[in-house]
Amino acid sequence: MEIEFFKPTVEHIGKMQELVKEEVDNGTILLRTEDEMANTIRSYTVVKVDGKIAGFTALHIHSARLSEVRSLVVAKNFRGLKLGKKLVEACIEEGIKLGLKQILSLTYQKGFFEALGFDEIEKDQIPEHKIWADCIRCKHFPKCDEIAMVYDL
């Protein structure tokens, strides 16, 4: 089995959107349009298994201090290979290289992120611009049932 992590190009967006569609439809991941993904393509890391896109995530920078793991997804048939863990670890490494101080995650998978060293925080600690830029677009807003977690770099 050949596993490859790489930075995508805009040509990968269609396949990435196909992969995340089910999670977007059920409200576990926020919809990102093709243009939004193209605009932030440098923030994504993709993993391929035997030449097929198996998962991806993005490290979105909110400020000189705070970044966020976004849109973490691994295809069901590739789960159990620790690809999600490796994608988040890639975000952590990138955050350190960029000199950031903290990585935020809004998640339904508390145990997964705790195992990677993230700590739960109260949602009122999330910067207001994050709420108005992203959360307001969520189908669950304003009754967010995600767990806010941070990793100190």
What residues fall within each predicted segment?
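C-terminal "cap" of GNAT-fold acetyltransferases
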Residues: 126-153
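Hydrophobic pocket/interface hotspot
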Residues: 16-17, 113
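A short beta-loop-alpha structural element at the N-terminal edge
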Residues: 2-16
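Conserved active-site alpha-helix within GNAT-family acetyltransferase domains
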Residues: 107-134
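Conserved acetyl-CoA-binding loop-helix of GNAT-fold acetyltransferases
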Residues: 74, 80-95, 105
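A generic "binding-loop/recognition-motif" signal
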Residues: 12, 65, 108-109
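A conserved beta-strand-loop-helix scaffold within acyl/acetyltransferase catalytic domains
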Residues: 31-50, 55-66, 70-73
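Helix-loop element at the rim of GNAT/NAT acetyltransferase active sites that forms part
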Residues: 18-31
